């Protein structure tokens, strides 16, 4: 066991974890934050995307101990304390950028990273940036529309 100390959604957390614990396991099983999903377990689908020190990472191939001393934001940490949705979350809802919802947390986290860290907004850039996120239900049209609307709202 090793002591892991980090901030998750603004809250300081310290737990003993086995060295091989994946970040997604720590988030879901230890902290019970189940918005981050496990889809493929091979970093291909993007359902497990979280922010590690402000950058999108796939938590299914990141060891929890790699996040020691870092700040992790999950989908639960995007909304305001009063429950007001983050502009990107609101855009996904408004544009119907989801169907079953399984991929949505990872899509939203990737989209927020795209806008904050890369400033990409046109359709081609959005589609390229979301290549690491798979949705098995939609044709991506509404997802791209949601990202563009969310980006515009985040710019205000």
Segments (PLM) and residue ranges:
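Signature of N-terminal electron-transfer/Fe-S-associated modules in redox systems
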Residues: 1-156
């Amino acid at each position: 066991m090793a002591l892991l100390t980090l901030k998750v959604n603004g809250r300081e957390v310290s737990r003993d974890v086995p060295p091989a614990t994946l970040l997604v396991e720590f988030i879901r099983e230890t902290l019970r934050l189940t918005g981050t999903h496990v889809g493929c377990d091979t970093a291909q689908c993007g359902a497990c995307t979280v922010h590690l020190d402000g950058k999108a990472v796939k938590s299914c191939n990141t060891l929890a101990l790699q996040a020691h001393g870092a700040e992790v934001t999950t989908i639960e940490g995007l909304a305001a304390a009063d429950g007001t949705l983050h502009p990107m979350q609101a855009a996904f809802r408004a544009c119907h950028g989801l169907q079953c919802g399984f991929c949505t947390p990872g899509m939203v986290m990737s989209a927020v990273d795209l806008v904050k860290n890369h400033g990409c907004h046109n359709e081609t850039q959005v589609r390229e940036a979301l290549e690491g996120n798979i949705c098995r239900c939609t044709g991506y049209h509404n997802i791209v529309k949601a990202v563009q609307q969310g980006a515009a709202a985040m710019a205000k």
